[in-house]
């Protein structure tokens, strides 16, 4: 019996595609909203903007003498904070051929991606300034970033300490009597998992009408602060070394002065190593850290940040030492961060200037900058996370 099936008329059997293309998962930019100090009476355009702060007089506690004219006192000079302006931007060049051949309309997608890149990029730049504040406490009993381990997690005492310091510094709260906290979800997990009466307790919903409109992502108020949970809060593999993973042999050699070598994709280090971990072995530079990991078939390729000192031969035994990821939780009051803008960032549709009008530019551009304005209104808590390695 002969069937007229999909094999018989295979030319009519095609793969179908969904023309709706999803975007990558995104976190919501939020740091620019913290920059609430901006120029009020800027004198002129310039490459930088200087803010000035008066200093108060010392308290006059001595009594006056009835017949003696008190001595005048001179006011101290103002303190200044400078914000250096810089150009920021990015661009894409879409070809006419892509527009004609694409199964999905790319123009709206490119516009959306460019717009998000604008907000995302500037938020990273602003956070890089904010997270460098001079006031910092470390999880557990640690005294530096490099000594923090995964067990040095955040606790309520850390928050009480920082809120007390902010109030002692006379920092102005950001919402009612509450300070702002930017916290990573993996740090928030540890805080809310604290057990007993000292743990995450008596929290209030961020919908409390008396607090006004708080930040998107607010998860509650606690210990004198309101918490904004966001995965974009900075973390880095710059804590203490952890226990080394099981060693394994190289299967794809790396050249001298090269930056790569390969191991079996089934090896422990192939499945558990992360970018930022240390890696060592004959021919690998002593300070090498992993910058990229890619797997293709049975081989996992490691890229390191320092060139190999010699050939990394096949069968060379390598060791990966995981480095603790340290999370930065930021607490601040008003005027912790200043922002100055010469041109507000925005999307730019560039002119089509090629001879055949095939190349269509779209990008974003802005001229602005940030600086910490009141250090006394800014604190940072550096901790590990109990779930960072999961």
Where are these regions (language model features)?
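N-terminal "assembly arms/tails" that initiate or stabilize quaternary assembly
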Residues: 1-84, 378, 382
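Extended, compositionally biased alpha-helical segments that mediate assembly or anchoring
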Residues: 5, 346-390
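Long, contiguous amphipathic alpha-helices that act as assembly "spine/axial" helices in icosahedral shell
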Residues: 51, 77-139, 171-187, 354-367
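Short helix/loop capping segments that flank catalytic or ligand/cofactor-binding pockets
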Residues: 59-62, 102, 190-193, 200, ...
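Extended, solvent-exposed, turn-rich assembly/linker loops in the middle of proteins
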Residues: 136-223
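Small/polar beta-strand repeat architecture
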Residues: 204, 232, 238-273, 280-330
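Long, compositionally biased low-complexity segments
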Residues: 216-243, 323-328, 340-346, 360
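Hydrophobic alpha-helical bundle architecture
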Residues: 321-354, 385-388
């Amino acid at each position: 019996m002969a069937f007229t099936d999909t094999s018989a008329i295979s030319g009519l059997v095609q793969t179908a595609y969904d023309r709706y293309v999803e975007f990558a998962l995104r976190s919501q930019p939020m740091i620019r909203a913290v920059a609430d100090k901006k120029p009020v009476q800027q004198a002129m355009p310039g490459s930088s903007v200087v803010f000035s702060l008066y200093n108060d007089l010392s308290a006059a506690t001595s009594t006056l003498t009835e017949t003696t004219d008190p001595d005048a006192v001179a006011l101290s000079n103002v303190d200044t904070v400078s914000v250096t302006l810089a150009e920021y931007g990015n661009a894409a060049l879409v070809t006419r051929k892509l527009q004609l051949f694409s199964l999905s309309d790319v123009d709206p997608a490119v516009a959306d991606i460019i717009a998000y890149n604008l907000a995302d990029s500037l938020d990273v730049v602003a956070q890089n300034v904010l997270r460098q504040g001079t006031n910092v406490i470390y999880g557990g009993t640690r005294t530096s970033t490099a000594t923090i381990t995964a067990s040095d997690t955040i606790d309520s005492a850390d928050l009480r300490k920082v809120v007390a310091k902010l109030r002692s510094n006379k920092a102005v709260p950001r919402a009612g009597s509450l300070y702002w906290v930017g916290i990573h979800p993996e740090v928030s997990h540890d805080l809310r998992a604290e057990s007993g009466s000292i743990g995450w307790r008596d929290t209030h919903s961020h919908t409390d009408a008396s607090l006004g409109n708080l930040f998107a992502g607010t998860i509650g108020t606690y210990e004198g602060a309101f918490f904004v949970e966001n995965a974009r809060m900075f973390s880095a593999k710059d804590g203490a070394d952890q226990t080394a993973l099981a060693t394994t042999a190289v299967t794809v050699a790396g050249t001298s002065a090269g930056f790569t070598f390969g191991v079996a994709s089934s090896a422990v280090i192939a499945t558990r190593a992360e970018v930022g971990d240390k890696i060592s072995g004959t021919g690998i530079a002593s300070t090498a850290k992993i910058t990229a990991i890619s797997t293709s078939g049975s081989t996992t390729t490691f890229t390191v940040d320092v060139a190999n000192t010699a050939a990394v031969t096949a069968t060379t035994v390598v060791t990966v030492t995981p480095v603790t990821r340290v999370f930065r939780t930021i607490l601040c009051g008003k005027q912790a961060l200043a922002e100055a803008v010469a041109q507000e960032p925005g999307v730019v549709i560039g002119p089509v200037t090629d001879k055949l009008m095939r190349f269509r530019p779209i990008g974003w551009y802005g001229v602005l900058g940030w600086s910490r304005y009141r250090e006394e209104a800014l604190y940072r808590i550096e901790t590990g996370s109990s779930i960072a390695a999961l």
